[in-house]
A protein has these predicted regions:
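Structural signal for interior beta-strand "rungs" in well-ordered beta-sheet cores
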Residues: 100-285, 289-290
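Terminal amphipathic alpha-helical/low-complexity segments used for targeting or macromolecular assembly
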Residues: 1-106, 111-118, 279-281, 286-307
């Protein structure tokens, strides 16, 4: 009996990259040959790569029955069984390579993903595309990571990270959204409910929570406080915000792009920055506070008189 191997759609981006020294097609070819079947590139039949099921079936029924379990996927149950089997096989191979999965069954990891030793992956974590993840990371729970290069010792907790590059010892989350096309340096923190898009964030900068950084370049050792927004879109075009090293951007600041904030600057909380800020300056862009003494009592008397 002859079989042809074709590209599968089990994974987001299934390629011919090797897993444990062989491509997926080579894995299946070897298994077919072991049980006495001929492999042919130009055969008419198409059979899917359910290697886990093939192994268990052959052990139970013997080599002669192997052909019965190689079949196309036509139903939802067949798809579920196939993807579950392949997922478990991939995850088990990662465990054998030194990755620490808290649950082999409850994490989805594409065949193209490469993960360093001693990285811990918690349940309900989805890692897809061509991800390269370093050693000693903590990923999840409840995280989505796709097409990323992530350094050693990073933590990504309850967050979405897509199409970005990240250095070593970064902390992301919980509930952060790292959108595509970011370059994030070493020891950067992007905390709760913060969003970063198409930006460069340099080493040791912190964005602790509740901030939006888009189309920006943020220098080293900066503090982007709670409620900071880079207003990058004017309804027609998107513009960039540039912040120099060691800048402190106070709470609830809006940076109206295009704008440059030089190094070693302070932006007062509540400011709306529309002009460049020079090195070493304190920028204050908010209306002056006015306190009206006795206003509450006067207001009460007026309401009483009217009634």
């Amino acid at each position: 009996m002859k079989y042809r191997i074709e590209a599968k759609d089990y994974f987001t981006k299934f390629t011919n990259e090797k897993v444990l020294g062989m491509t997926p097609a080579e894995h299946l070819k070897r298994k077919l040959e072991v049980v006495g079947h001929e492999f042919s590139e130009d055969a008419d039949n198409i059979y899917y790569n359910d290697m886990f099921y093939l192994d268990s079936y052959v052990l139970e029924k013997g080599p002669g029955a192997a052909a019965e379990v190689l079949e196309e996927i036509h139903t939802g149950i067949q798809f579920h069984n196939a993807t579950t089997a392949v997922r478990v096989e991939i995850n088990a191979s990662l465990v054998n390579e030194g990755v620490k999965l808290m649950s082999i069954e409850d994490s989805y990891i594409d065949v193209n993903v490469r993960i360093g030793r001693d990285t811990v992956i918690y349940p309900n974590t989805y890692i897809s595309g061509k991800c390269r993840i370093g050693a000693g990371c903590i990923l999840g729970p409840d995280s989505v990571i796709s097409d990323c290069f992530i350094g050693d010792g990073c933590e990504i907790i309850k967050s979405v990270v897509k199409g970005s590059e990240m250095g070593n010892e970064c902390k992301i989350g919980p509930f952060s959204h790292i959108r595509p096309d970011n370059v994030i340096g070493d020891k950067v923190k992007v905390g709760a409910f913060a969003e970063v898009k198409k930006s460069e964030i340099k080493d040791k900068t912190v964005i602790p929570h509740l901030a939006y950084v888009g189309d920006s370049e943020i220098g080293r050792n900066c503090n982007i406080s709670c409620g900071v927004i880079t207003a990058n879109y004017d309804g027609r075009v998107k513009s960039r915000t540039i912040v120099g090293d060691n800048a402190f951007i106070g709470c609830n600041t809006t940076l109206i792009a295009p704008v440059n904030v030089d190094k070693d600057t302070y932006i007062a909380a509540g400011s709306t920055i529309t002009e460049d800020v020079s090195e070493g300056s304190l920028a204050i862009a908010r209306s002056r506070q006015t306190n009206k003494e006795g206003w509450v009592e006067k207001s009460k008397r007026k309401r009483t008189e009217k009634s």
